[in-house]
Amino acid sequence: MHGTRSVLIVDDEVEIRHALRLLFEIEGFTVVGEAADGDAAIDLASELEPSFIVLDYSMPQMNGAEAAQEIRKVLPASRIVAFSALLDTKPAWADAYLNKDRITELMPLLRTFIR
């Protein structure tokens, strides 16, 4: 597994992935990869073994819940943050949840897992 500050970003919107990458890099996290759908997320998570996975719920081909279930099989220790505009509460498949409208709260949330 990469360092405790390694992140895989999974979102079908390139603008969201770009904004998250910038935010993570400014905060000293290492973005080890980006994926636009659940299938790619599973492959990259298995290959890169990130500490954190920021995972959108609504994506083409495979949603975040389905992807998280597969990722958990190979990386049970990785922390998955559900990052979605569609969900109102933390889903069972995630370690934490954050609405996309509250992006500024993402870094404090991740830091709680590092401590």
Regions found by a protein language model. Give the residues of each.
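Acidic catalytic/metal-coordinating carboxylates
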Residues: 37-40, 63-67
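Two-component/phosphorelay signaling modules centered on CheY-like receiver
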Residues: 14-33
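Non-catalytic signal-transmission and effector/linker regions of two-component phosphorelay proteins
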Residues: 1-6, 104-115
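Active-site residues of response regulator receiver
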Residues: 11, 56
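Active-site beta3 strand of CheY-like receiver
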Residues: 48-54
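Conserved phosphotransfer cores of two-component systems
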Residues: 46-48, 70-78
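Receiver (REC) domain active-site loop signature in two-component systems and cognate sites
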Residues: 59
